Amino acid sequence: MDYKTSGVDIEAGYKSVELMKEYVKETMRAEVLGGLGGFSGAFSLAKIKEMEEPVLLSGTDGCGTKVKLAMVMDKHDTIGIDAVAMCVNDIACAGGEPLFFLDYIACGKNYPEKIAAIVKGVAEGCKQSDAALIGGETAEHPGLMPEEEYDLAGFAVGVCDKKDMITGENLAAGDVLIGMASTGVHSNGFSLVRKVFDITKESLDTYYDDLGTTLGEALLAPTRIYVKALKSIKNADVTVKACSHITGGGFYENIPRMLKEGTHAVVEKDSYPIPPIFAKLAKEGEIEEQMMYNTFNMGLGMVLAVDPADVDKTMDAIREAGDQPYVVGKIEAGEKGVTLC
């Protein structure tokens, strides 16, 4: 008996690494020391000496059950973008610059082409966020997971000067809320999504006029990465007072996380266009409006607060980065929380 007969194919692992090398190479930054295949990823921190008080920021996450759609559709080259986005957006909304990322893929069986496709998406997410992919792990779990299944997670590390951290401590009544458009459902709420829709290849390949695409393409659209938008805002000399990454828990859970005591966020629901996938979800699943806003991003992947005098500069900076901003509300004095009107 050998390792392969027990369900772990070492040769497939080697082939996976060879296939993914070209994608990983495209993410390299000057600070990366060494190459792929070492026992650890190494990243020089020499540049942060320019900061007064450098602070390392970290984020770890996965794609939830969205990976099930990728498996059913047999489309694996975008789900990695989601894994990166979930981590680097958290770092960015704290004021940080992502530095590097590492991924973890657990699978029932290592199919090299599939694993390489997943890493291709991870590398694309890293390129979109200017983070280096400095390592990762692909673990075969025979007997624990079905051969065709996998799960994907990762973590990112970033840095910022302490004085530039976005903390919400200077938030004040009268500040303006600006939302940045999402691509759709992003990476949260898919357990509910999978209860609403019949997740089969046939149903996911069905084209809907109201979506302008197939159901699968609408649901699998990669999570938008907002790193460059926030960097553009900083370069425009705008101080972001507070920022929230709208993920699991939707508006009701995530917007209050950016508020300080004594401040209340008011969001106008008709101030921006809501992607049609949400109306379809609500209708097909008979989901009440409050539950929709308490589960999904409802078209806004990130919400930030700025001084009224900085609104125009902020909107311009976001557009220059390729994202779509909307003025969606304001900050009022009151109990910490959010009101949708």
What label would you give each PLM region?
Residues E22, M28-T183:
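Glycine-rich phosphate/pyrophosphate-binding loop regions near the starts of catalytic domains
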Residues D2-S6, K114, I118-S129, M145-L152, ...:
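Glycine-/charge-enriched secondary-structure boundary and capping motifs
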Residues M1-E31:
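N-terminal amphipathic/basic leader segments beginning at the initiator methionine
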Residues A173-E217:
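Acidic, glycine-rich loop-and-beta core segments that form the ion-binding/anion-interacting portion
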Residues G13, K49-E50, C63-K66, D161-D164, ...:
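Short, acidic Gly/Pro/Ser/Thr-rich loop/turn segments
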Residues V17, A116-V119, F190:
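Hydrophobic face of alpha-helices
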Residues D9, D61, G174, H245, ...:
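Residue-level signature of catalytic and energy-coupling elements of molecular machines
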Residues S16, M20, A42, C87-V88, ...:
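Buried hydrophobic packing segments
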